[in-house]
Amino acid sequence: MYDTLPPELWVQIVDYSGEISLLLTNTSFFELFNLINIKTDIIEYVMENDLIDILKYLSLLKKLGHPIIVDKNILNIKTLNKYLIKNCGENQLEIVKFLVSLGADIRAGNDYAVGLSSQNGHLEVVKYLVNQGSDIRAENDYAVRWASGNGHLEVVKYLVSQGANIRADNDHAIGLASYYGYLEVVKYLVSQGADIRSDNDYAVRMASRNGHIEVVEYLVSQGANIRSDNDYAVRLASQNGHLEVVKYLVSQGADIKSDNDYAVRLASQNGHLEVVEYLVTQGTNIRVNNNYAVEWASKNGNLEVVKYLISQGADIIADNNFAVRWASRNGHLEVVKYLVSLGADIKSDNDYAVRWASGNGHLEVVKYLVSQGSDIRVENDYAVRWASRNGHFDVIKYLVSQGADIRSDNDYAVKWASENGHLEVVKFLVSLGADIKAEDDYAVRWASEKGHLEVVEYLVSQGAVLS
């Protein structure tokens, strides 16, 4: 049937259906490609629809010098290059070869194909590209650097055999291999002359930071300085909770008190209790920097760390009760309760705790603070105003039930709820008597300015004037 239909009819069929695959059913249909109105990239279509047999067929036609390929403009070099790179990254060697046969440039994008296939560990693709003339040294030896960073030892070895420079970019290869914990790659690079001390001992610092104990031990055995950059290694190992690395570094002479006891402060901040306990046994000072450790453990909700630090003498009321104020602000109810049980002042800094708990929508914290005597009316009803501004409906309703004045500060609550598009809050406030016309119809003007159509429509229905 295909061969009996005239070309004019096929052009109409393809234009009407939008289905370019009809052109791929018979070689003669390629002749119609320049006649149809559909602007479809044939290679894009073939690749996106996994029509590999068509790709092979196109390759054969190209090899035979068929005029369909030679004379017709159906092969887009940018598209060929795009899918060459994509398939190199996906280890599709057969497809890569067909794309190259159709004219794809293996060196497109500054030899990105060999860089990506190296980065992803596709050794056979890498070898093929190198045999076809790819430059493995492109982009400051990107290929070997990221093959190292991703732990592809065999690719690294092959690239080195082909002349790759493992020391490019300030020994980036061993830095990356250490950062990601690829011990065998690290050992191989060292055997090939990589400098583990480059960039202020980047390798051991990053291996420590990321908890790669075996890499750390190996680098130390090769002469790495664990105290570089103000004892960065032990500080960041502590910050990230890598206890075994911390212990090892301490055994090698790391100073846990460097940078104002950074190690215990950040371990506390991030909730790494075992690291904190160990550092305390080694003599760290948990009260440095105005009791930073307990303050930030509280701020981040790390209750067990908070309890331990207090047991070791941390001062919970330091810095104007920072601990309970920020635990409240961030919604950490159990921490708040514990601190209050030990004497923290929830009313410090003009009732900061309840104001910010309200503004951030932490209803259970707000309820608890009110039960403990917090004043929700301070700072001109800051609590309900900011709960309204941020759309925390449940908090608003609770505060109103406790006597908050929604009209404080020239009807701030409804103005800002409107400006920020909180329709249900606006409706609730209006039902309680909020004046939507306050400050020259501020509410509707700013709701309109910010594009909150439903709020605008509601306010207008309630008598607001949109000038």
Swiss-Prot record:
NAD recorded as keyword: no
Superkingdom classification of source: Viruses
Parts of the chain that traverse the membrane: none
SMART domains per the UniProt record, alphabetical: ANK (SM00248)
ANK repeat locations: 38-70, 79-108, 109-138, 140-168, 170-198, 199-228, 229-258, 260-288, 289-318, 320-348, 350-378, 379-408, 410-438, 440-467
Pfam families: Ank, Ank_2
Gene3D superfamilies from the UniProt entry: Ankyrin repeat-containing domain (1.25.40.20)
Bridged cysteine pairs (disulfide): none
PANTHER family: REPEAT PROTEIN, PUTATIVE-RELATED, SURFACE ANTIGEN BSPA-LIKE-RELATED
The name this protein goes by in its record: Putative ankyrin repeat protein R911
Species for this entry: Acanthamoeba polyphaga mimivirus
Upper lineage: Viruses, Varidnaviria, Bamfordvirae, Nucleocytoviricota, Megaviricetes
